[in-house]
UniProtKB/Swiss-Prot annotation:
This is F-actin-capping protein subunit alpha. GO terms for cellular component: actin cortical patch; cortical cytoskeleton; F-actin capping protein complex. PANTHER family: F-ACTIN-CAPPING PROTEIN SUBUNIT ALPHA. F-actin-capping proteins bind in a Ca(2+)-independent manner to the fast growing ends of actin filaments (barbed end) thereby blocking the exchange of subunits at these ends. Unlike other capping proteins (such as gelsolin and severin), these proteins do not sever actin filaments. It comes from the Eukaryota. Heterodimer of an alpha and a beta subunit. The keyword Cytoplasm applies. Keywords: Actin capping, Actin-binding, Cytoplasm, Cytoskeleton. Belongs to the F-actin-capping protein alpha subunit family. Pfam families: F-actin_cap_A (PF01267). The keyword Plastid does not apply. One of its GO terms (molecular function) is actin filament binding. It comes from Emericella nidulans (strain FGSC A4 / ATCC 38163 / CBS 112.46 / NRRL 194 / M139) (Aspergillus nidulans).
């Protein structure tokens, strides 16, 4: 039988966008250990942060940077190419410390910096609340391109997250592989979640930053159009069937007496008999 830690870890890793603190609060309430269980959940917090491309603020900075498996160093240290900084992450609190200067050592440094500049322009145009990163991976034989955008509206009972992860082998390859993840949670008087993943294989004519980001932007635009079409079909199909239908009585309404009905009184300002 799974232990309390295993159950609680699954709750952490399945937390909806922007609701991790709520899940942690519920875990403390539901388990007999209370606050004492949280330190034992550190591995689950780390997996959640890396897979969800959690964003954190560096000490003394306002811009958020990404935490992922692609920019992990030793232990709980990560690096950000754009700010040339490495930093320690407390995965439970999503706070940072011990920031240090970091110099990117990669034979593909020029391409990475060019990709960062072009990706930044793309992100600012299409994803206002976003963070992004470009990192050397696989012993410098490939490049990872990451983008995450969060929109939280708890007052309106919804939160959402967009993530895109691409990998581009440096060399003779002209194909980018990647995935787009969209997660939305709506919870007013119910609980509706959208979790969708789109695998991608994108051909590029050359390995320039402009070509790579242009093809990525096109693929993202096409997927957004696919989602919009799917939403329209769902609204007229599955969702429509969930709406409560008014009963059909086949009785005629006596319009001359409508003022005596409750609805008629409401409409006429209570002037019915």
């Amino acid at each position: 039988m799974a232990s309390t830690v295993e159950f609680a870890s699954s709750f952490i890793e399945g937390a909806p966008p922007g609701e991790l603190a709520d899940v942690v609060s519920d875990i403390k309430t539901l388990t007999s250990d209370g606050d004492d269980i949280i330190p034992s959940l550190a591995p689950a917090f780390e997996r959640y942060n890396e897979s969800q491309l959690a964003t954190v603020k560096l000490p003394g900075a306002s811009q958020e940077v990404i935490v992922s498996e692609f920019n992990r160093l030793e232990g709980s240290r990560y690096f950000d190419v754009e700010s040339q900084t490495s930093f320690e992450v407390d995965h439970i609190t999503q706070s940072t410390s011990a920031a240090q200067s970091y110099v990117l050592e990669s034979q593909n440094a020029d391409l990475i910096k060019s990709l960062l500049k072009t990706l930044g322009a793309h992100a600012r145009e299409h994803y206002p609340s976003s963070s992004y990163g470009v990192y050397p991976i696989e012993k410098d034989s490939a490049i990872a391109i990451l983008l995450v955008a969060n929109r939280y509206s708890p007052n309106n009972f919804w939160n959402g997250r967009y993530r895109s992860i691409y990998q581009f082998p440096v060399g003779d390859s002209t194909t980018i592989t990647g995935k787009i993840h969209v997660d939305v949670h709506y919870y007013e008087d119910g609980n509706v979640a959208l979790n969708t993943t789109k695998p991608l294989n994108i051909s590029v004519p050359n390995a320039s930053a402009e070509s790579i980001i242009s093809r990525i932007a096109s693929a993202e635009r096409n997927y957004q159009e696919e989602l919009n079409k799917a939403f329209g079909q769902m609204a007229e199909g599955a969702f429509k069937s969930l709406r409560r239908q008014l009963p059909i009585t086949r009785q005629k309404v006596e319009w001359e007496k409508v003022g005596g009905y409750r609805l008629g009184q409401d409409i006429s300002g209570g002037k019915g008999r």
